[in-house]
């Protein structure tokens, strides 16, 4: 988080040209890194998006010195490749870029998805095709306004999706129109001004292109001064004399006049005007920087930083049982929250988002969200244990509500002493935790002496907490059982879990009687903690030198041990010895063991499938792999950096191991191939259909070596799941008007064999939702389509989040694990009508609402699969080749 809110007062574009733009002579507007197999050396939409975001982030850092650290100097970044790791290490410290890179990945994947999703890839308004320049501009500025609305409503996931769609259209303008051919050297001055008419547009009767029978068409454009764009495909049909988009996938380019004018890539087979690709990329980058800067100006620095997660800090999310017996637990939550707020206030680690959801049978909620720590503390302080006490409670419903409002990559803490009354939600909540990539930790005070607090209507099952264990396992979290007198001490893990720790993989992953748990420590790890909880008789920890330490409290040869009932925490002395460590535990049951550490080296990962039948080749993003599909795993290593010692060797990762969950059996090893320069940390692996043939959860472990050849071992923070079918749920651009009836589109496909499926729909809050598809019988490689209608009542609150869930599960004779699709929407009040006035040279652009159109905003497989591909393609320039253009006062 940035230290203060600084009013925006940026100079105009001509006043702030800090660095010279420099692109290589062979540098696309293809979607993502997979596109480069077809057109090597091209600049993708992801490149442009990420580069623009880094430019604006650097400018923000230069203007606001970091708290407690030396200010950044522009000269330190001149002539170097601009990397998020370097930028964030200079501002916040090493290992602080993970959240930013994840947020930027969301924007980039939403951008790339516009070329793949069925209702956006062929819409000319979303790509500035077919001379629909006015309509395209309306959709562009509408998406930017929706980005602002969603960001102010604290729905940053939706804001990033709308921002990605806006940037895609903006970048396409410079590749699909003839703006570059007209000799223009700057972005279009009116494209982000909805009140300014676009001038000199070609009309229907104006011929724009001549016939070209070659792949490369440098002279097919008729030399006039009117603005035009190419037609793609057959809808709408290309009028006589008009330009085509052109390229391998464009059926209109075979009709006279043949050829086309797109500048998407360096390949003449895809881009007839490939020779102008570099100029188009320069202008698209400039325009993207302007769009990011516009959002910064409209939102202010703090909200803009939250939009892109320009912070190493996590969010703080509590789900609290408020039944009468929960007084101690509620007080423990208050103490930890207060401690966190006070300890981190004004620092980079101050939480950026606060979520609070109470529950008390028979109800749950409402959800409280804020970015203000004082408001959160005030709301939390008003919560007290209420009457009642029946076991069980509506815990999973409350957790589902918290997941809906908690940002990705966050920790959620559940305080309760009751089992779930809504256990039927277990699988759905498991999937939602993986879709949101949130880790859930349950703090359960199971105190049998507390009979006066909990009225028990029946003998309680010893398995009643199994749903919590399932959700914790799926999310990478824990279930920690404790007692009243220890809850305040055990709750201290709230703060420790939010300290950007990584969880070290154990072999085996669960305690096996008589067998030690083994984990590896490398030179990049520090502040190692071991947590052990359960009915423990004894344990010991042994370092690589054979030195061991038992369960005795206090200081020991390896570190310091604290005990709170049946919960132990061992904090190892720094620096820890590198090599193989062991933990031996003797217990009556299956104890929980977790080893965590701080490190600058971590990784993000995404899944996708190669696509070759859209407007461009590329990678179709998936949240989870689908059984039977050849899938690409894309890994983005964070914390590599290059600024401190540019000449030093970088860590190298060679392969990834897939393990079954929870037993830990190895399913396979897959080699990793580097993508682009090693300092980018981009790796890819091909997961075969054989490896992904069975629907099941699995974990990912990254294996490699450090610069000295010592073993590196990192694990993904939570498991992934192979889902049995592909489930896509599409809707409007993400915004709902009160009183409207909104169509949604559903597609389900099987790639692993016949499937007999029942489909169920849910919506939160309880709006009316109808569907014309309740069952589906699918053969191999067969799809089914359905339509849903969501009715938004007049009473729907503006800025409220709506989540639609579709579940596809096997019938009784065909027990297939369920697959879930999630669609997030936002209720938004209509924007006031703008006055049609001409802006002065010193005013900011005004974002107005475009007419909503039916276009998908998310793709899901057991979750929303806008979350697939990681960072873009090979680097195309150095920071000596980056433009910082932050002023928008003249817009």
Swiss-Prot record:
Alphabetical UniProt keywords: Glycoprotein, Secreted, Signal
Q: Where is this region: Disordered?
A: 237-272
Is Signal among the key words of this record? yes
Name the UniProt record assigns to this protein: von Willebrand factor A domain-containing protein 7
All copies of domain VWFA, residue ranges: 313-506
- Gene3D superfamilies named among the record's database cross-references: von Willebrand factor, type A domain
Q: Which organism is it from?
A: Homo sapiens
Give expression by tissue.
Answer: Expressed at low level in different cell lines.
Write out the coiled-coil annotation as residue ranges. none
The record lists glycosylation at 55
Pfam families from the xrefs? GBD_Hemicentin (PF23560), Ig_VWA7 (PF23619), VWA7_4 (PF23610), VWA7_N (PF25107), VWA_4 (PF25106)
Lineage of the native species?
Eukaryota, Metazoa, Chordata, Craniata, Vertebrata
Transmembrane region(s): none
Tell me where it resides.
Secreted
Also noted in the record is: Found in the major hispocompatibility complex class III region. May be implicated in susceptibility to lung tumors.
The signal peptide here is 1-28
Q: Which GO terms describe its cellular component?
A: extracellular region
Alphabetical list of InterPro entries matching this protein: GBD_Hemicentin/VWA7, HMCN1-like_VWA, VWA7, VWA7_N, vWFA_dom_sf
Q: Give the PANTHER family listed for this entry.
A: NG37, VON WILLEBRAND FACTOR A DOMAIN-CONTAINING PROTEIN 7
